[in-house]
């Protein structure tokens, strides 16, 4: 399943990590700027405090959702104040299923 997680904050990163555990999923994380560069270079590092472990996931990243990009699922994990900017981008995209998290 091709999955995009739109937003690389705490929720988005945890969701991307969880979805990536199923090897049938091809997870792409939409991140921008310096944070995208860190994920590309070092992987998505999560420190799990309760489990007392650290995981590093290598996954695809992108900094844009183009209208012609098609995913089976798009999880939207942006902050409420960012939705007004994100909704036109989602509307222009050809993917059918959008799940808003948060």
PLM features: what roles do these ranges have?
Residues 53-58, 62-102:
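Rossmann-like NAD(P)(H) cofactor-binding subdomain of soluble oxidoreductases
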Residues 1-51:
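NAD(P)+-binding Rossmann beta1-loop-alpha1 motif at the extreme N-terminus of oxidoreductases
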């Amino acid at each position: 399943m091709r999955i995009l997680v739109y937003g690389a904050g705490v929720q988005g990163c945890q969701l991307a990590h969880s979805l990536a555990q199923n090897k049938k999923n091809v997870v792409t994380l939409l991140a921008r700027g310096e944070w995208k560069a860190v994920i590309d270079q070092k992987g998505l590092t999560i420190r799990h405090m309760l489990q007392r472990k650290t995981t590093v996931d290598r996954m695809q990243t992108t900094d844009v959702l183009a209208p012609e990009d098609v995913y089976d699922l798009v999880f939207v994990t942006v902050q409420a104040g960012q939705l007004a900017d994100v909704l036109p981008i989602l509307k222009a995209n050809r993917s059918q299923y959008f799940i808003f998290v948060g």
